[in-house]
Amino acid sequence: MPVVSMKQLLEAGVHFGHQTRRWNPKMKPFIFTERNGIYIIDLQKTVKMIDTAYNYVKDVAADGGVVLFVGTKKQAQDSIEEEATRAGQYYVNHRWLGGTLTNWKTIQSRISRLKELKKMAEDGTFDRLPKKEVAVLTKQREKLERFLGGIEDMPRIPDVLYIVDPHKEQIAVKEAQKLHIPIVAMVDTNTDPDDIDVIIPSNDDAIRAVRLITAKMADAVIEGKQGEDDQQVAPAEDVAEEVSDESLQDLKNSVEGND
């Protein structure tokens, strides 16, 4: 069985791409058709590529790898934090700070400062300081927490990045490429897929689509960490046979507005 069914993808709106005037021609192989100026993503391919991404992330986790979930757009922030936390991994869901990967030592110093400020708030140090100074330190702590809280306990540079909308997260993509860190990403029709190692063709603007696929990547981490190989994902060829006829008809009906 595939990790995600065609029905789940349709219900989450994964098939809706961007307007045709805002496309990247390199995404053409993953486009099913066009409707009312919107590209419709080929979900038959998405089903198979989610399986590939799932197995990839699962294998990284099984080897003790670190997975960093990245998504700073509003539609992704909650899912990124919740699913990364559920999987026992790390996340960036607000602004990506330049150098997060390529200048990790500096980032670690800021994380140390965050931990220091947290300790000061907990051990009563703030109670002995002037109110104005406490206000300044509290504001500093909140800012650091916002940007670094999701990687506060990350032990090292991650082994893989999972990104929602790499078109928006270009700095993260470039840093990962510079350090040869593989990227798994939800890639919409306006994005260059060549920058991504394992792509998942998908609507990256719909909250339900982001939540569905991000949750599956978290599931992959959890399964990998548990070493549960008894629930193997079906090979891509078998998946194609399972979804090709009936599910493609569902997609056509959805695109054409039929019941």
From Swiss-Prot:
GO biological processes: translation
Pfam families with a match to the protein in the record: Ribosomal_S2
Matching CDD domains: RPS2 (cd01425)
Keyword terms, alphabetized: Ribonucleoprotein, Ribosomal protein
Bias kind Polar residues: ranges: 250-259
Region (Disordered): 224-259
Cellular component GO terms, alphabetical: cytosolic small ribosomal subunit
Source species, domain of life: Bacteria
A molecular-function term among this protein's GO annotations: structural constituent of ribosome
UniProt-listed InterPro entries: Ribosomal_uS2 (IPR001865), Ribosomal_uS2_bac/mit/plastid (IPR005706), Ribosomal_uS2_CS (IPR018130), Ribosomal_uS2_flav_dom_sf (IPR023591)
Sequence ranges of Acidic residues compositional bias: 238-248
Alphabetized NCBIfam families for the sequence: rpsB_bact
Family per similarity comment: Belongs to the universal ribosomal protein uS2 family.
Protein name: Small ribosomal subunit protein uS2
Gene behind the chain: rpsB
